[in-house]
Amino acid sequence: MFLAAIHVITFFISENSKSFYTMSTPTSAFNAMLDDIGIEIQDDISALCSTLADPSDAEPAPPVHDVDDLLASVGPDKRKKIRSGLLTIHPPSSHPSWLKPETWFPQCDDILEIWCAKFEKGEDTGNLHVHIYFKLKHSNTIRFELLQKWITKHVTGFDFKPQRSATKNSTQCVVNYVLKPETSVGDPFIWNASCAFDQKTWDARHKGKGKKQEIIDHIMARDWTLSWASLVHESDESRALLADCGWGKRFQEDRAAAQPRRKIKDVVILYGAAGTGKTTMAMDWDSKPDETTKARYYRRSCDEDFWGGGATAYNGQRVIHYDEFGGQEKFASLKEITSIGLPGPPVKVKGSGRDLNHDTVVFTSNVHPAGWYKGVWAKDPHQFKPFQRRVTKVLFFPRERPDGTENVPSDGNPAHFVDQTPEWVAFGDNLDLAIEHAESCWPLPATIEDDGGGAFAPGFSLTSEPEPKRRRFF
């Protein structure tokens, strides 16, 4: 139907041009009426003619295998103009009127081209719902906010997905999705014989994958620890497939969140001289042949509160490594991160948050662990015990090997270390025993200032000036 307003005269011309009507009304009032019912009006006869035949309908289209490939999301723009799409509604009953267009759409005879509807029950929930596919005539569109107004007059909630492209092939695929007999509850409703289930098109969906399934398969074949940026730019194939995929980033992030929650079982300290192989051992800790280093291992930087971001973000790795550690992590946080038998705490990742999902913490340090939190332990020596009992293994890397040669690992000559776990366990809650142990095997600066300097815990700095009134740790 072609409608145009010229000043105060409105012309109504039928599509076959056999009827002609005139009426007089103020232009502003007429425009307000059109805006209220949400019908988009063509400005001239050439625009009308261009929409009476959809050129894409005449072009062959490949079979569509997933109805989600044909549908989009409305997005935040509630004034978005809609011509066709899939409605899902949860009506209060199974009365046939819920399937009919006049229940939902005013003036349906004037604006509808296709309408089909059917009751279904959810496979998982068993809840009754209605699937409706509608397509408006070429000269008509409605805004989403108006559709929402019409639907919510009768029900409180609904889901709507607009059709990406209203070609014949895509339209038939969505019609088939609504009318498929295997999920029907009762008979479907088809308005004015405007469409029908097509078995040939329905069968063709099994001959290949839809794009969404292709994307899912591509993502699932990659490591779940990969960041979205790394996954997209992995190859030309990935870039072509994933560059414009809006939901893929969240899908990949949810893979990490879906991993089973681990419980912390090991807290390991590797301390001693520099260059003796501590960091190399930490990076290889508990490695497995079928597991990549990136999937297993994460090095924690204490220079910031965040646990990385983007490609450097923590992403569910099971081994967390603190390198060059001297107490930089807040003591309260460290206790949570090393709580044996419990899952890791939530942490901040740039742009989001994440639960730590590790089972092992490895510390490498040039400092004896008795000095890591000297400020905390000087104020309250009883705070040493919660830390001491969390540690399950302590390995000391001396500067020299037993034969007097330098302790530098090489091919065929692995790092030399001494297992001091029994001594560590024997400390119990006695901080003084730990201090004496440090004095005997790995001397450290004579005193520790409470000035917050250096890269260590607040209060840890190196000095040669004695202060006998302060507690001696080493």
Swiss-Prot record:
Coiled coil spans: none
Region described as Disordered: 455-474
Span(s) of short sequence motif Nuclear localization signal: 248-255
Subcellular location as annotated: Host nucleus
Record GO cellular component, one term: host cell nucleus
One MF term in the entry's GO annotations: RNA binding
Pfam families (alphabetical): RNA_helicase
Signal sequence interval, chain numbering: none
Keyword tags: Host nucleus
Function: Plays an essential for the replication of viral DNA. Presumably cleaves viral genomic dsRNA replicative form to initiate rolling circle replication.
Protein name stated in the entry: Replication-associated protein
Organism listed in the record: Avon-Heathcote Estuary associated kieseladnavirus (AHEaBV)
